[in-house]
Amino acid sequence: MSLSNKMIFLVVDDSKISRKWLIEMIPKKIVENAEIIEGSNGEEAIALYDQHKPDVVFLDITMPVIDGFEALERIRAINPEALVVMISADRQKSTKEKVLSLGASAIISKPVDEQEFRTTLLKLVF
C-alpha cells in the first residue's frame, strides 16, 4: 500500500470518545489522504466493512449488539485477508490468543499507547 492511494480506515468502538482518540492517533501524513469511517457496534462494523472494504479496521472487543469477536469472524468470512486490529481493555493472555486465532492482525490493549498504535498501523500498511 502506498500513500498515493486513498486509504480507508474503519474505526469501531461503542465509545465516541475512544473512536475520536483512535482517529487522532493515525499519523497526519496518512490521514490527510484517507477516508475514515466510524461505527459503534459489531453489527455496524460488518455492514460498513462489506460496503466500504476498508484497508484497516480498528475493532473494539466489548460492544453492544455484536461483540468484536463475532464481528472479526464475520469480517474475515467476507475477506480472509482483512487487516483487523483488535482493541481491548482485557489484558488476559487468553483474550490475545483468542483474537489472534480468529485471524486478527494485531491486538492493542486499552488504554491505547500512541506509539504502539502508530507502530502497529505502520507495520500493517507498509
Region spans (language model):
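C-terminal output helix
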Residues: V112-L122
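Two-component/phosphorelay signaling modules centered on CheY-like receiver
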Residues: K16-I37
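Receiver (REC) domain active-site loop signature in two-component systems and cognate sites
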Residues: M63
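Short amphipathic alpha-helix used as the core "switch/output" element in two-component signaling
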Residues: A47, F69-P80
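Alpha4 helix (beta4-alpha4-beta5 surface) of REC/receiver domains from two-component response regulators
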Residues: R91-A106, T119
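Active-site beta3 strand of CheY-like receiver
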Residues: H52-F58
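Helix N-cap/capping motif at the beta->alpha junctions
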Residues: E38-A47, G68
